[in-house]
């Protein structure tokens, strides 16, 4: 056996061992073994691809993107690497790069449910919900068990206010995968919206049984408890959520609501303003902040904040501005 053949054999051995570690979720060891495989055979495109997948599991998307680019350089016809790189580009907010990769492989992937899922995600990131829904529809025609397509389509329906269709998608997703956290979370939020607060708490508890440190479920369960009048239990849950993710605008808003309901208006205002400073959309935040300012007899500041809320289609801000600022 020549040196070259021996190196390729060694590379293949490392690759198989790496795949075993990957399946066992030992991603650090898998990464080391993929590097060994690439070191033995620098043109081993599958090893680059799997190394990229490994880096994604380790929450290193920028590194994954570079490795996937190497895979495509080694084998420009390796369309699977383009698809994974498109997904990675989406995570990194590189929408044009994701679009370019998807265009390159469109013909080869015309019957791929995953391709249409990724393209649907791209359209959603671009703010094109109708294109997104169309691609999720196609993904589900090709694979009716595509849980991510169900959840993501449901999320768009939810944002559009089509609660019935959203609920159906989330329930269908859970019928396939009962541990699907986004579906459980969104059904919990819908239950809050419908004032079915015990149902909501049950959904969030199902998430917390799977992962006791899920910041969104802790916060949302806390919000349900605020609505139920269980203020102290609510504050503990929201506080734990903020320990895990201090920049969750919804948790800051909810802590503000807790302080407001507890008669601590100054502390409530501090939390609301922290949420506003993050500059991410949070339902009813501007409306609630303005109401608190008005209670403190600062009508000018209240009207100013409501005016900002109108731009964000905050229903409380719209109603309060109409009532108090004309």
Language model features: what each stretch is:
Residues 3, 9-12, 284-326:
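Terminal, low-structured helical/coil segments at or just beyond the last alpha-helical repeat
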Residues 179-271:
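Eukaryotic tandem repeat interaction scaffolds
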Residues 1-50, 57-62, 66-69, 73, ...:
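N-terminal leader/linker segments that initiate helical-solenoid repeat arrays
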Residues 40, 74, 107-109, 142, ...:
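Structural marker of alpha-solenoid helical repeat scaffolds
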Residues 10-12, 45-46, 79-80, 112-114, ...:
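Helix-start (N-cap) detector for alpha-helical repeat units in TPR-like alpha-solenoids
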Residues 50, 84, 118, 152, ...:
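Canonical tetratricopeptide repeat
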Residues 24-33, 58-70, 91-104, 126-138, ...:
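Structural signature of tandem alpha-helical TPR/SEL1-like repeats
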